[in-house]
Amino acid sequence: MKVLKFLFIAVIIVGLSGSLTWASPIANARAEADAEAAAEAVAKAVAEAVLPALPLLAGLMSLPFLQHKLTNG
């Protein structure tokens, strides 16, 4: 019974602390814009990294098709 009471209190505390964090006046008002900018930067970096390897990746992805054609005619 003590464990259930402890878990109940812990869930309430975690829930309240989460809601207080979102309602805090020091919360970042531009959080969505910042997250979008960060995601765009990551997408651009990944695209720049993958672009030189794209022909190699395309060749490797066609290997199962070629093997099937060679073995099954």
Curated annotation (Swiss-Prot):
The modification Asparagine amide is found at residue 72. Residues 24-49 form a propeptide. Expressed by the venom gland. Residues 1-23 form the signal peptide. Keywords: Amidation, Ion channel impairing toxin, Neurotoxin, Secreted, Signal, Toxin, Voltage-gated sodium channel impairing toxin. The keyword Membrane does not apply. It is found in: Secreted. Vertebrate selective toxin that causes pain by targeting tetrodotoxin (TTX)-sensitive sodium channels in peripheral sensory neurons. Converts the normally rapidly activating and inactivating sodium channel current into one that does not inactivate. Is active on both Nav1.6/SCN8A and Nav1.7/SCN9A, with a much potent activity on Nav1.6/SCN8A (EC(50)=196 nM on human channels) than on Nav1.7/SCN9A (EC(50)=1.9 uM on human and EC(50)=1.2 uM on mouse channels). This is U3-myrmicitoxin-Tb1a. It comes from Tetramorium bicarinatum (Tramp ant).
